[in-house]
Amino acid sequence: MAIVTLAELLEAGVHFGHQARRWNPKMFPYIYTERNGIHIIDLVQTSQLLTEACEFVKQASSDGRKVLFLGTKRQAAGIIAQEAQRCDSYYVNQRWLGGMLTNWVTIKSRVTRLRQLEEQDSSGLIDQLPKKEAAVLRRELDKLRKHLNGIKNMTRLPDIVVVVDQKRETTAIQECLKLGIPTICILDTNCSPEIINIPIPANDDAIRSIKLIIGKIADAIYEGKYGQMEPTELISSAEDK
């Protein structure tokens, strides 16, 4: 059973692709038509593939596997943080640091440093230092939080990565390919479905489109971890969208 209706997808503007001249021919199977020079995405396939993605992450989460959400573009950053936190998952919504996955040992040491500085900050230890030393540590803390806050509790590589904007997050996707980490990605008409495990053809620029799709995936992860969402949680989730 589909977890989203075609009406919901239409209302969120999921069907609007890029200008036809900017397309990637590999996306042809997911394009319904062209209208006024804009490619229109086949929402039947969007619904089917989003349902497949949700079933996949729900089962994976039920089995204890961990999901990382990735989206650093302005339209996605806030949604990525909100939805990942809601389903108790990891996220990166600022700049992707090269080697975040393939050089995890080094990144993990920076995550450990972030936690140490946060402990020192919360205990008041930094406040007891001379002003210059305290200022240096606070600058370091702010920088680490900016890039690593969404993965500060991540102790190992994620089992699945959910991506918004393939073109922007190429480095991260290549790292996933190298490590054999499955990817789910919102793919606009200028992307390539060949390097993604579960492509979700959709508008990756519109906030409502991103929020609808990422929200559905977060719902599925939540249900996989904790069981069916309570009615109050479902209402809150719908209002957020």
UniProtKB/Swiss-Prot annotation:
PROSITE patterns: RIBOSOMAL_S2_1, RIBOSOMAL_S2_2. Disulfide bonds: none annotated. One of its GO terms (biological process) is translation. Pfam families: Ribosomal_S2. Its main location: plastid. InterPro entries: Ribosomal_uS2, Ribosomal_uS2_bac/mit/plastid, Ribosomal_uS2_CS, Ribosomal_uS2_flav_dom_sf. Keywords: Chloroplast, Plastid, Ribonucleoprotein, Ribosomal protein. GO terms for cellular component: chloroplast; small ribosomal subunit. SUPFAM superfamilies: Ribosomal protein S2. CDD domains: RPS2. GO terms for molecular function: structural constituent of ribosome. The keyword Chloroplast applies. It is found in: Plastid, Chloroplast. Belongs to the universal ribosomal protein uS2 family. NCBIfam families: rpsB_bact (TIGR01011). HAMAP family: Ribosomal_uS2_B (MF_00291_B). This is Small ribosomal subunit protein uS2c. The gene is rps2.
